């Protein structure tokens, strides 16, 4: 579903991404982990078509994000760790604005907005202006907007930052149901025990290079993901 082939990205003389290659398969939850500055956000924004890259190719469901960006983005949703929302809009207006861009039918959007707003406990706040919300509330609005158009590919950068424990639990259930229904999830996180329990596969990035990628159970062996990660980082 997501194919990353020999992708490199330069910032001046520094390689933020260095010949990165791996595949995220349809119907799996894939974790992308690494220290701050390792290249996680750079790759995520490149996959989403937000950031250009210098070498290589990224395919979404067989289509190039460079050559067919609209076709790719139609089946994707992206949630950042610090969502940039239209602060002066009401939450419901922003969510409907996103649904309009994806041509979501009225019946589908109403059902999904109600479902996720109730799940995240903000159904009574949808009429409020976004600028009055806390970071966690804004994160919930971004998640509802992303989920309401039922994307085939959900890409998230630190999606659990700012969420309360119930919202984290609910989000994990959403992720499981999404892949059960044929969707694909690719996300970065620093919460390694959660990635260990939730994900099918994982890639570990260090200084812009992939140092380990594969099945979560095989990479872990009889160790915790945290221990494996720290051992690889120490090399």
Predicted regions mapped to residue ranges:
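Walker A (P-loop) phosphate-binding loop of ABC-type ATPase nucleotide-binding domains
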Residues: 35-39
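A short, proline-enriched helix->beta-strand linker immediately N-terminal to the Walker B motif
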Residues: 148-152
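Conserved ABC ATPase signature
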Residues: 129-136
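ABC ATPase "signature
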Residues: 213-214
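Catalytic Walker B motif of ABC-type/P-loop ATPase nucleotide-binding domains
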Residues: 154-158
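Conserved ABC ATPase "signature" region
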Residues: 96, 100, 107-125
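Conserved ABC transporter NBD signature motif
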Residues: 56-67, 71-72
């Amino acid at each position: 579903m997501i194919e990353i082939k020999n992708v490199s990205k330069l910032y001046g003389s520094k390689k933020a991404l260095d010949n990165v290659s791996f595949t995220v398969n349809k119907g799996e939850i894939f974790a992308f982990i690494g220290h701050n500055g390792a290249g996680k956000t750079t790759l995520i924004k490149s996959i989403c078509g937000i950031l250009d890259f210098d070498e290589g190719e990224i395919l979404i469901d067989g289509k190039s994000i460079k050559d067919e960006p609209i076709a790719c983005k139609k089946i994707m949703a992206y949630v950042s760790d610090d969502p940039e929302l239209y602060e002066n809009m009401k939450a419901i207006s922003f969510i409907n604005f996103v649904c309009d861009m994806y041509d979501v039918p009225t019946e589908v959007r109403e059902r999904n907005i109600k479902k996720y707003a109730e799940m995240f406990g903000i159904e009574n706040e949808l009429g409020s202006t976004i600028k009055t919300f806390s970071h966690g509330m804004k994160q919930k609005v971004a998640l509802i907007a992303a989920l309401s158009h039922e994307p085939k590919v959900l890409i998230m950068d630190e999606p659990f930052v700012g969420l309360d424990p119930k919202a984290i639990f609910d989000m994990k259930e959403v992720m499981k149901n999404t892949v059960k229904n044929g969707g694909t999830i690719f996300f970065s996180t620093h919460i390694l025990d959660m990635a260990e329990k939730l994900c099918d596969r994982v890639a570990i990035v260090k200084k812009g290079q992939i140092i380990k990628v594969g099945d979560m159970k095989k990479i872990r062996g009889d160790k915790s993901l945290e221990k494996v990660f720290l051992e690889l980082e120490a090399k």
